[in-house]
Amino acid sequence: MTLPALKPTQVLVKTHQASVCGSERYFYRGINVRPQDEARGGSEVQLGEAPADSHAHAYPMGPLGHEGGGEIVEMGSGVEEYLGGGAVRIGDRVGSLIYPTFTDYWVTDIRHIQPIPAGVSYEVGCLYEPLGCAAWAALHAGYKLGDVVAVNGVGFAGNILLQGAIKSGASKVIAIDMVQAKLDVAKALGADYVINASEVDPVAAVEEITKGEGVDVAVEAVGGAGAGLVQALDMVAHNGTLALYGDNYAPIKEFCFHRFHEDGLDVRNLNAVHYTPLRSIEHMREAYRVVERGVFDLDIIFKHSVTYRLDELPTVFQNETAHLEQQGSLKTIILP
């Protein structure tokens, strides 16, 4: 194998562990995710279809994989410190914030990786981007002591957000998902109520639990076609908080913003990394201080994850995109 020559600010990383992001499953299917794509393709374009001009927002958008970590084995001549501070050394264990991690070795700019904190295991540190994003979201979702919280979507990130609500002193925490296995994890983590949205209307169930008042904080961690976002809006109480984590890929054509105005809702963007590079790094370091202190139960996350080898990746995507809404495991881990 011939490894590429490094530019001055680049490093070569040997992969220890990567993982699959939920968004990549949609991209793999060629799902049309941006309003501008739909406009370009015309009124006939629907979620899950490529525009007529063949410019689908499809997978891969770039080099394969953006979750993972490994060991720095070579450095460019201009590499001195990480963005945000800290000397860079050969042998450092690092987590990735961007492509390309679905490979044995990868080259990236030093701005796009961060050292795994000393108090965090290698395996947990290789979840740097997804875990950091979820932990930061849990810190900024707006939970207060005594709140009633609903987490709509309890996959990997949703179950981190759910733990954040419990640790923050919520009086009731409601977990919602279409997959019973994920709800079982949420229950084991301490959810007071679990609602299987494939069996009952989750909005009606929340209304019954809250005696018609709604929840103080509605967390949207489903993403996808936007149904979870509409449900979260229908669950939140007057003057409540709508905390948006999931990436909703399709335009929501019938969506009334009047409730935001009339009910004085607090709307929070819980995406940690779509900011300036330095601010994104600050968010991740803030999140990992909490991870390093053992606030979250991560053992149960790994217990309910699945592991594959890198050469099995094509089969992984074929299998996991067959039923996008029924993914049973919390995280799919890829080993070189």
Per-region residue spans from a language model:
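Glycine-rich beta-strand-centered segment in the early N-terminal region that forms part
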Residues: 4-19, 31-98
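A structural motif shared across PLP-dependent enzymes of the aminotransferase-like
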Residues: 98-110
